[in-house]
């Protein structure tokens, strides 16, 4: 079974995590900070004990607060270990755009929602997710 890996930081990502925790697939949570002193939410504890959930971070213990730079570094870390990546929104000149272009240059499979903000990444070689999957994802939002 394929693991789902994400920072699960934004409100939408946290909603997705809540749904994924009800499933059976392995999950990897990568906060954009150190996990040295992390308080594990009760909802995660059983999944950690069962070996279904892993909390992973590339950051040293001094990196205690999430910021844009750490989030960008975390996103690159997640992309490095992921086989395929879903980007929902990558506007031109956003912080996500260069990551998407780099992933395509590295030969990673990059999935994108069918939205005008992603057209440049689609034209660069990104893959549209199916209409059915997109409808299911948008139903979660």
Model-flagged regions — what are they?
Residues 1-141:
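Glycine-biased, small-residue-rich flexible motifs in mid-sequence functional cores and linkers
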């Amino acid at each position: 079974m394929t693991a789902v890996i994400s920072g699960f930081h934004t409100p939408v990502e946290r909603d997705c995590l809540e749904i994924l925790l009800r499933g059976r697939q392995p999950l990897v949570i990568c906060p954009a900070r150190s996990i040295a002193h992390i308080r594990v939410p009760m909802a995660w504890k059983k999944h950690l004990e069962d070996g279904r959930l892993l909390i992973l971070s590339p950051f040293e213990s001094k990196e205690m607060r999430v910021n844009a730079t750490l989030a960008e570094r975390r996103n690159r870390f997640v992309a490095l270990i992921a086989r395929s990546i879903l980007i929902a929104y990558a506007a031109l000149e956003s912080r996500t755009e260069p990551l998407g272009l780099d992933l395509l240059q590295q030969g990673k499979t990059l999935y994108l929602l069918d939205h005008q903000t992603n057209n440049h990444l689609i034209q660069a070689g990104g893959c549209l997710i199916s209409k059915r999957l997109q409808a299911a994802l948008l139903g979660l939002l």
